[in-house]
Amino acid sequence: MRNRCILPVLSFVMLCTAARGVAGSLTCDTKSISFTDGYAGWQLLAADGERDVTRQARYESGNSAVARVDVNGHVTPIADGSTLIRIQHDGDKLEIPVRVQGAGADRPVDFKRELVPLLSRMGCNAGGCHGKASGQNGFKLSLFGFDAAFDRDAIVNEARGRRVFPAAPDFSLLLLKATGQLPHGGGKRMRRDGNEYRLFRSWIASGMPSSAPDAPHVVKLRIAPADRVLARNGQQQLAVRAEYSDGSIRDVTRQAEYASNLDVVARVDADGLVHTLQMSGEAAIMARYLGYVAVFRAMVPHGERLKEIAEFRPANYIDDLTLAKWKKLGLRPSPLADDAVFLRRVTLDLCGRLPTAAEARAFLADTAADKRAKLIDRLLDSPDYPAYFAMRWGTILRNSNLAGSTNAAYAFHNWIKDSIARNRPYDEFVRGIVAAAGEWQESPAINWYWQSRDDQLHQVTADTAQVFLGVRLQCARCHHHPYERWGQADYYGLAGFFTRLGRKSFGEPPPYFASANVTTGEKDPLTGKTPEPKYLDGPSAKFTPEQDPRHALVDWMAKPDNPFFARALVNRLWGHFLGRGLYHEVDDLRETNPPSNPELLDALAQDFTKHKFDVKHIICTIVNSRVYQLSSEPTPHNKNDRQNYARYYARRLPAEVLLDAIDQTTGTRGNFSGVGSNARAVDLPHEGFGSYFLDTFDRPRRVTGCECERSTGATLAQVLLLGNSDEIESKIAAGDGRLARLMKEKKPLGDILEELYLTAYARRPSAEELKRTLAHLEGAANKQQALEDVLWAILNTKEFMFNH
């Protein structure tokens, strides 16, 4: 019973009117409040329909000697007894019964559960203050409070105990600095009349006790409301409640930390009040408390809610679920892209190349209603599809020659390409990598392990989580993840699946094998023992000496109810084809980074699992959707949309694709040593092929499994290279290039221009473009040079450099 008294037991019913309320539209999320100690608090949420009026309502306590309520609806206990909190707004009234017990009881303050969250909220244990590796001015705390015992020792025992003074708590250095009574680099962090000061003072006065080992602990954090559609320049008060292992609930609205993932849409203050700004869109507001997180989603519509969008005709469930979101947000989509734009887009996305002029002519002339679907099937059946996606997978799987074995890098590249060409089920593809063993000639995927040989256990653990599960687990190696639920136990639990992996002492790469006799020397810092396998967010696993735990790990990944595996892959594919993942970034699936359309993500993941991890099926579903086929031209209704796919998001071509596009348009080939003369840049098996162009346009170095290593941003060096480099000039003027061939064939200037436009843009020049360009050419003394200028101009247009 003593531990139960540490926490206030409070009951609440979401959005229910109090029993003694006067009839009207005013509601409160709380039916009654029951406090069991004097350190508690409770945030009321008042609403008028769906509109938050917490900060507009008036509050009054029937007996302020028992409980007080401030102007923002926050209730605090004062003394034992019962009273009513009256809420008034626009003539409506509510009364919330409040009962207080134990307000005067001198119960101990729990350091971990009550003070560590305050240190986090005040920023004391952040990386820029006492939480950094070296501490600050001789005082170091654990980063984000992940080690409460360490923090207590630092406060109580370090520096000969000078930070606390139990005999006269108010003169403790900890409180004097935090209240600004003594100089403090971090400034004033608390008020002497505040609840934070009361808690710290009481703890010091009682002798700075350690946290009771059997005290209730947080099991879940909830935020109310979970989401809201808010107007521009609107506001919403949040309430955060922690559920404890003994069944009790504590309001921690004023102890939690808050952050917005999109400040241009919505901001949040220290007390959980969300303010929306002028920008429409969606923002996720994170609340963090004792390592747990909860998220509120603020949706700011682009316009009034729409009943119908008659001009958009769904083709599959992707369109249905996206359409529902547009209606909710008042978004009208752009029209469908025309045939030329679609042909170029889907060929680039599926094959990493431009359509040929012949392909463009045939597609534009085709009048069949299903020609787009047939085109998609042809492209997926072509050898260019596995070649392009082998490059993309080789990048995030870090297939590199940096490890010293070019032959193994070639073999791994070919293994990936063959798996894609055969449409190998994704779970089998992952098993071939994660559970790879043997010699590289028979098992090329061991090169994935060989790339990590200097820090194998940790690199493989981090890559497995990020690449195949979409979880960035690296932070949890050293401390609890600041924006997720993952801690060191989760990290080392996943690492435990790889502790039996060993390698021979010969060969590059050497043969790999799994054995219970392998000793990594790595210890779990929490236990001091070899990491034991534990499924992420799941149970521990036990294996016999003969078993390879990695196979069990893949079995767990492929289970239909796995919350990460299928979602990670469909989100990665969605990001590739639509320019932005439903989770953004595509390999960062976490609660505090929620998907822009969770219903769509779930539907894609379920479809993927239902079809036995058929990657081609999901790709077909995505690119056959009307959402994928929308124009990139914004309309007045969607010009500010960045999250909901009301138009196609244009993006610069990746380095390898752009170089190949230039070669294709100019009729030249890249000159890469060690590969065939017909090899494209996307065919290169690793990053070791020298190319100033590829490096300038941010070809990944393949040193990380993160998609973020590839950049499609613009730099001055890129502009200068395209506009004024010998490399581009030589391709345009090549004697065996496209222009030279067309001139030798004595093609009419109009035909030459059509060929260039069809090759570069998959469309014919408009009448105005043709008129202006022909006028330029016909007035030029040197037709060859004038055509070279035209081609150079084409290569420098956004229409060429971007997939749109």
Model-predicted segments: where are they?
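Short, structured secondary-structure elements
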Residues: 128, 141, 145, 151-156, ...
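Positively charged n-region of N-terminal signal peptides that target proteins for export
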Residues: 1-5
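Solvent-exposed helix-loop boundary motif
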Residues: 35-39, 47, 65-78, 83-90, ...
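Proline/serine/threonine-rich low-complexity linkers at boundaries of modular beta-sandwich domains
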Residues: 20-25, 209-220
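Catalytic cores of secreted or luminal carbohydrate-active enzymes
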Residues: 190-210, 717-724, 728-733
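N-terminal edge beta-strand
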Residues: 24-32
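Short, intrinsically disordered, charge-biased short linear motifs at domain edges
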Residues: 108-119, 459-466
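Bacterial N-terminal signal peptides
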Residues: 8-17
